[in-house]
């Protein structure tokens, strides 16, 4: 499923996909299975409260491979690449992606799970290898997932960007390219304090896209990340 929002106002939430199971077992109890895979929410304009690549409301369901593209909308609360919203969820929210190019949003979750569900292997991309984050874009805290297990959660920083904070990522990758980088500014600026729960041994920098040739007596310096406060 794919939902594209280009304008107007949605006073609740926009969903790429929703999973509910209204079937009953032999004893008349609601079944608790049902997965959400490969759904997409594209936000190009308008105003919404929350956005979900997929919302899985079954207890044992999984959210996998769902995507959100934020490309100009205003999101008053949060974005969830893949979410398990059953209070006692036992499934996993894994392999979901949120791409941020422009617009405004509160917090961002690659994966989200209530109950015992896991939120691993999710990705958030700031910009792309060809497109910078637009000036004026506002983003709160970006979470790989809402759980303490951060295995394979990845934040890709492809452009200069300012966000509130980042949390619950195992991998942090900076891709530096002439077309998307202004070296006069920090690549990633945090505005609400020092980040936490990052494994700095997993920091990766790809500078193969920089073609600048500094003078022999000048160092070419790029400040990867700073804390505005």
Name each region found by the language model.
Residues 4, 25, 32, 42-44, ...:
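Compositionally biased amphipathic helical and low-complexity segments enriched in hydrophobic
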Residues 5, 31, 43, 70, ...:
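Structural motif
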Residues 1, 8, 12, 22, ...:
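The right-handed parallel beta-helix/beta-solenoid scaffold, focusing on the short coil/turn
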Residues 115-118, 128, 133-228:
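Extracellular beta-strand/loop-rich repeat segments of large surface/secreted proteins
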Residues 11-36, 49-64, 78-94, 107-120, ...:
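Glycine-centered low-complexity coil/loop motifs and glycine-rich tracts
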Residues 11, 25, 32, 58, ...:
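Serine/threonine-rich low-complexity intrinsically disordered regions
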